[in-house]
Amino acid sequence: MVAFTSLLAGFAAIAGVLSAPTESSVEVEKRQTIGPGTGYSNGYYYSYWNDGHAGVTYTNGGGGSFTVNWSNSGNFVGGKGWQPGTKNKVINFSGSYNPNGNSYLSIYGWSRNPLIEYYIVENFGTYNPSTGATKLGEVTSDGSVYDIYRTQRVNQPSIIGTATFYQYWSVRRNHRSSGSVNTANHFNAWASHGLTLGTMDYQIVAVEGYFSSGSASITVS
């Protein structure tokens, strides 16, 4: 996609279905290739969604590990983390991330009251999610400057159903596929620009793609 607004439309479709509550939460085996759903895998919460296009294989591994392989995938997003998340967690992630096309590696989650969808983007493929957005500020954390943005979604799917809500973004300038993210640094920086979070819902390290191909193998802790 060539515009931030069109990207967000794709994100809304992805994130809305990703975040919608399901009844598929189950404790899965140590390593298992799964279909779309949410649940727990070796002590970590996972969430995986795709739009039904062929070519995506999501596999939960041991501990906080997961792998994704995709080709001409349509929309998908999947990853592992915590339910609920916290506002001061230091999230460690490591592994490989090899996108060809439009794809993202990010800390992703939601809060309630206010209803907020948020991203801390660590790496991306050919499309920069800040394209066309209004920059509110920046924060230096974990070895890089991140640019801060806010966008709004109107009557879009969310963790409470169709709603109007804001999205908060930190986009890292120096891409990486391994490291630590001090989420408090981002949340505090957002708050200094009036971007406050409510009660935390889930918080995961997510790989997502939009009509692209690639592979990722990530471990979260």
UniProtKB/Swiss-Prot annotation:
pH dependence: Optimum pH is 5.1.
Associated pathway: Glycan degradation; xylan degradation
Glycosylation sites: N69, N92
Active site (UniProt): E117 (nucleophile), E208 (proton donor)
Catalytic reaction annotation: Endohydrolysis of (1->4)-beta-D-xylosidic linkages in xylans
A molecular function (GO) term: endo-1,4-beta-xylanase activity
Keyword Secreted: yes
Keyword Signal among UniProt keywords: yes
GO biological process terms held by the UniProt record: xylan catabolic process
Class of this enzyme: hydrolase
Chain ranges of the GH11 domain: 32-221
UniProt KW keywords: Carbohydrate metabolism, Glycoprotein, Glycosidase, Hydrolase, Polysaccharide degradation, Secreted, Signal, Xylan degradation
Transmembrane portions of the chain: none
Record's signal peptide: 1-19
Major localization listed first in the record, in broad terms: secreted
Similarity remark: Belongs to the glycosyl hydrolase 11 (cellulase G) family.
Protein name: Endo-1,4-beta-xylanase 2
Originating organism: Trichoderma harzianum
